[in-house]
Regions:
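C-terminal cap/substrate-recognition subdomain and adjoining C-terminal extension
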Residues: 35-48, 52-58, 62, 77, ...
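A generic structural micro-environment signature
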Residues: 7, 94-95, 102, 111, ...
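Non-catalytic pre-domain segments flanking phosphatase-related domains
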Residues: 2-4, 9-10, 14-84, 106, ...
């Protein structure tokens, strides 16, 4: 991508959407032996190589925050939309939310013992990773439906937060909250410093990503849009209202058509 020069013909939404694609454009990490003068000139976005991708980010922010620029964007209109999987957090070898659901299966089966000898729950309980890798999409849908529904929204949020505090990736031996891309954290910080409001639009589960994003990126729930299930309204014995997560799909945010309002 070439550096973006000021031009009255530049589409502001296009400028913002370049941020979604930047990680794929070049290598992100600076060499450990980078000269001192390069580090000094690269105080902004220090984990990025000097090059077209980094310059594009700097140019987007420059031309949209300079009041004398024809591409100036007022404070209330400054938004930056990011994908999540493979952009902000790692997606290989397995999505973090899928790992969470697989690890939730024993607790679900404890409450619903009739699932113990039913596939795909039987395979997950076996701990056989080779067999789990072969599970079909339909199998995963059954697991997600069983592990992500049937509890109140508050209970789900508490469970997800608790898991994120203790779970470790088996390969890296690090919390999943640390398996994010440092260069992109720098982009988020740089945009906030220039009055941009970051949003996440993802095909991942909206409720889980909202918990993760608030903890790791500081992005509040209302700025995260993802695949969402329905909820059922009810009252507790003490008369307090609550929402229970339902298996009904409310928004499938995995297709371009479902995201057209954000482009």
């Amino acid at each position: 991508m070439s550096p973006i020069a000021p031009s009255s013909g530049i589409n502001r939404r296009l400028l913002l959407w370049t941020l979604v694609l930047l990680p794929a454009l070049c290598g992100l990490l600076l060499p450990a032996t980078a000269p001192a003068q390069l580090v000094t000139s690269s105080a902004l976005l220090p984990s990025w190589n000097d090059g077209p991708a980094k310059q594009a980010i700097l140019d987007v922010v420059r031309v949209t925050t300079d009041r004398s620029s024809p591409n100036y964007v007022s404070f209330e209109d400054r938004i930056a939309v990011f994908d999540q999987d493979g952009t902000l957090w790692v997606e290989h070898p397995m999505y973090t939310q899928v790992v969470y659901c697989l690890e939730r299966v024993p607790a679900v089966v404890a409450k619903r013992p009739e699932l113990k000898n039913v596939e795909p729950f039987k395979t997950v309980l076996s701990g056989n990773r080779e067999a789990m890798v072969k599970l079909s999409l339909r199998d995963l849908e059954k697991i997600l439906a069983a592990t992500l529904t049937g509890m109140t929204v508050e209970e789900f949020n508490a469970e997800a937060k608790k898991w994120l505090e203790t779970a470790r990736d088996p390969r890296w031996k690090r919390p999943y909250t640390e398996l994010v891309y440092q260069p992109m954290l720098e982009v988020l910080r740089y945009l906030r410093d220039n009055a941009y409001k970051p949003y996440i639009v993802t095909g991942g589960g909206q409720d889980f990503v909202r918990v993760y994003a608030e903890k790791v990126y500081g992005i509040p729930p209302e700025q995260v849009v993802g695949t969402a299930g329905g909820t059922k309204f009810g009252y507790a014995k003490d008369g307090k209202p609550f929402l229970t997560k339902d298996a009904k799909l409310l928004l499938n945010d995995t297709t371009p058509a479902s995201r057209k309002g954000f482009t």
